[in-house]
Amino acid sequence: METGSEEEKWEKLDAEFDHFVVDMKPFVLKLPHRSERQRCALWIRKLCEPSGTGAGLMGRKNRNLYAKLLLHMLRRGILEGPFTHRPEPGTLKTLPSYMSIYFDEPNQAQPKDSSPEKLPDWVRGELQTGEQRLSDSWQCSSGEDNTLVLAASDAHREQYTGKLRMRSHSVSPTYREDKQHITSKICEVHSKTSPISLDDSDIEVRLNSWNLGIENPRYLRQKPLPVSLMTPKGSLRKASSLHDDHFLSRMHEKELDMKTKMMEAKFSEEKLKLQQKHDAEVQKILERKNNELEELKILYKKKQTETEETIRKLEKKVQILIRDCQVIRETKENQITELKKICEQSTESLNNDWEKKLHNAVAEMEKDKFELQKHHTETIQELLEDTNVRLSKMEADYVVQMQSTNHMIKELEGRVQQLMGEAENSNLQRQKLTQEKLELERCYQITCNELQELKTRRNILHKEKEHLVNDYEQNVKLLKTKYDSDINLLRQEHALSTSKTSGVIEELEQNICQLKQQVQESELQRKQQVKDQENKFHMEKNHLKHTYEKKVHELQSELDKEKEDAQRKIHKFEEALKEKEEQLSRVTEVQRLQAQQADAALEEFKRQVEVNSEKVYGEMKEQMEKVEADLTRSKSLREKQSKEFLWQLEDAKQRYEQQIVELKLEHEQEKTHLLQQHSAEKDSLVRDHDREIENLEKQLRAANMEHENQIQESKKRDAQVIADMEAQVHKLREELISVNSQRKQQLIELGLLREEEKQRAAKDHETAVKKLKAESERVKMELKKTHAAETEMTLEKANSRLKQIEKEYTQKLAKSSQIIAELQTTISSLKEESSRQQLAAERRLQDVIQKFEDEKQQLIRDNDQAIKALQDELETRSHQVRSAEKKLHHKELEAQEQIMYIRQEYETKFKGLMPASLRQELEDTISSLKSQVNFLQKRASILQEELTTYQSRR
């Protein structure tokens, strides 16, 4: 019944294929290009060939799927998929599951007229060449003419051979050779029968169907009559009943032999077909599973690379923004330093201008005095000249001291800037350390991925091992069933003749049981070895994980410690800079006090000389102090603004870093969630696959759709987050531009204020000079009267005060030189400390990098060794399996030889006891059993060759 249902299915599939081929005709003829037509003809010829489509039900279904897809594409007018190139030699590959999308689409173009047309010449040529090759390869010539008329048994034989022809499309080439061998034997028995040609009737029908429809399709043909089986028992009864007619009995025995041979061939055919079906189905399931797993892996890798690229782009943007902020900060600091220099230069130039103007005014006054004092004594003139010379020297010394102090201040400011640059360099080194930490984390992720790949490889090897074990068990079961069937046949045949053979058979059964026990023991030992090796591998993997995590924790702790040390050093440097700035402010205040004291001394001297000039000088001094106070206020405001701007930048940076960290955490959570979902779906698919094979494709499609939706949602979220981050970056840039514009406006306003103050000071100076001139003219007369009395007193006081001033200036110079020396020593010590710290940090970095590289190489070596060990174990196990199979085969052969030897002995014993008819019947049965044994030996060798080829492919 099962064979009949299979034949009906085959005929339905062939009829469906015939209809597909007929429907293709108008679309192939309407193709515009000749190359496309030739390609379609080649594909149709490939589908019509039995060697290309494959054997069994699955091969025909695959062929019909190809034909349906080609017809669908021809209706659409576009050739895609596998039909863009010529067909490959060998059997057709199974269509992937995603090709079913083509069948779901509606047909856009349908043929308006399906009237039969004539084939072009090139199509006929292609198909005729294909027919000739197929007919040449499938014919079995006997070399004699049809002269004899067939008897009733020959008619049955012809029907059976016709049936074999109908089924020959789905049989493997090895089986075809066996079949041709059997038919050649039949032809030898009937020496003058007609030659049996195994030409392909299916191909003729399909090729003829290109003309006016299908002339004789499969579903209109008559089914072949089943052959009635005759057992050897019936033949024995007939032979015993028809003992008289030797001629008729011989003919009947020959017919029975032929029938038994035909039944044996049919039985072997069906067995081979079932085996090929089973192998094809198993291979298709494995290929589908592997393809689906590879597609899922490719999708996951693509999505992972896309997320990594987005993260890298965001990190690059963050780095660019940080660099822009650093550049802006450096430009602002440079502007502040330039403004400081400009202010100092302007103050120095103003001081020099005022001093020059004062010198000019004093010179004019002295000239007037000398003109008034021409009439005085020469002694007074000499004293006045001496005092003027001393004053000029003191002023020159004061100018030199001021220049030296200003130069020292500039040098100290330059050193402060250098220290700031070194601090920035330390910050850059800290950033480099953070980057290296990120690289280490990436390396850690890469190693984790490698571990996952090793896990997948281990799982694949485990699956292959299970598959090999299952194949081995199936082969053992088949061999057991064969062996049991052979033993049962031998028992039935020899139970009639003798009861002595039962003991030998029991001994053989005991040997078989022992062999089974040995095989089971070897399988148990192999399973135990596999379990032990898996436990060892898990232990080694866990140990490696623990060691690697410990090393990562140690590296992270070292990095944290180095960060804390760097922060402490930065705090120390900042405190030292603050102390130096305070010292500089103190020095500047001391210098200002000294300048004020000198100005006070000069004012006292001038008050004694000119009473009215003291008021003007005091007013000018107050104005200068106001200007200096305004300058200090503006400096403080600038410093406050710069500090506020730095605080704002730091706050923005911290916010941005927090957002990046949050995004990374969200991304990792989504990744883990997706991985968990993927693993859960995978498990459910594997479980459902064992229960329902037909529903697997639907579940996979649903899972893929859900996975794609989740990925699209994650992409949308990532896109929204990226857009938000870009908007924040844009806002920060706008804020930076606005702050820069405000700073520029403030600088312009300060410049305008400075110019206005300069103009006011010049106007005030001109008015003061005019007043001085008027007052000097008034005082001239008064000075003439009081000068003579006061000159002596003033000279004495001036000498005493000059000596005091000289002493004070010498003391101040000594103090300032000491302070400068101390500052130089502190700067040199700070430079040495910074250089030492840099060298220590570089050494630590090099040590950490070397350690990490060594550990990485060790891990790689360990992984390689483990992989090699696993490969060696697999090879040894495969060798063990092969040796066990060979041993089983040898033992089977030995058992068969023993059986044959026992048969021969018993035949020799029973030759004298048995009649001639019984002897002939036993000889015939022995010859048939020998042929069966030879056939089974051939089949075992074929199965071994297939096993070796399958293992070599794996």
Curated annotation (Swiss-Prot):
Record-given protein name: Centrosomal protein of 112 kDa
Pfam families: DUF4485
GO cellular component: centrosome; cytoplasm; inhibitory synapse; plasma membrane
Coiled coil: 276-954
Keyword Cell cycle attached: no
Keyword line: Coiled coil, Cytoplasm, Cytoskeleton
PANTHER family found in the cross-reference section: CENTROSOMAL PROTEIN OF 112 KDA
InterPro entries: CEP112, DUF4485
One Gene Ontology biological process: receptor localization to synapse
UniProt keyword Cytoplasm present: yes
Locations listed in the record: Cytoplasm, Cytoskeleton, Microtubule organizing center, Centrosome
